[in-house]
Amino acid sequence: MIFEFRDKLPLGIFPFMMVLESLTDSVYLVGGSVRDMLLGAHPNDFDFVTDVPMEQLIAEFEAGGFTVTQSGVAHLVLNVGFGDTIVEISNFRKDKACDGRHAVVELGTIDDDAHRRDFTINALFLNTKTGEVVDPTGNGVADLKAKVLRFVGKPKDRIREDYLRGWRAMRFASRGFKLEPKSLRAVREMWKEIYDNSTPERVRVELEKMAGI
């Protein structure tokens, strides 16, 4: 599936794409920005994923006058800024361990990266050079068209990796998405566990997003 997306991007995103695309053909937008653009919206938050090593990314962006926050390097994530725009740039990752909030990660493939994400609609990758939408789970595009919310893999496993995903499911339900039966059953059966393992600060963020704040 090829998607014409560039007219949906704010101008501030193009400098990041220019640097990344000069280094590799493997540059993807992923997650909410892809989901929202496919729904016809203009997203504000952008996450990139690439195969360029962290050290090279840091060197190239700093040489180009970008600000680079390296606090997430151990998790293979950088926050990179230019002007008023900040984006997240990560490598393809695979979870080695997870305690319900924090994951220990290692380098992985695009398939690994997709299968560590929460919902199929958030596991879509858009190649910025070709416009190709890559759907490693095989369900993301169809679920988005049908407004179906489906956890990637086993719902209870995904929730236990990050209990905030239970609250996030509610947020998407409030936006008109329908939880598929296995996902809905998991949220219902695990609700007390989700509640007991969620910090007020992170829940507040999800509730504010639900309310459009």
Task: State the predicted function of each range.
Residues 1-213:
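Catalytic cores of the polymerase beta-like nucleotidyltransferase superfamily
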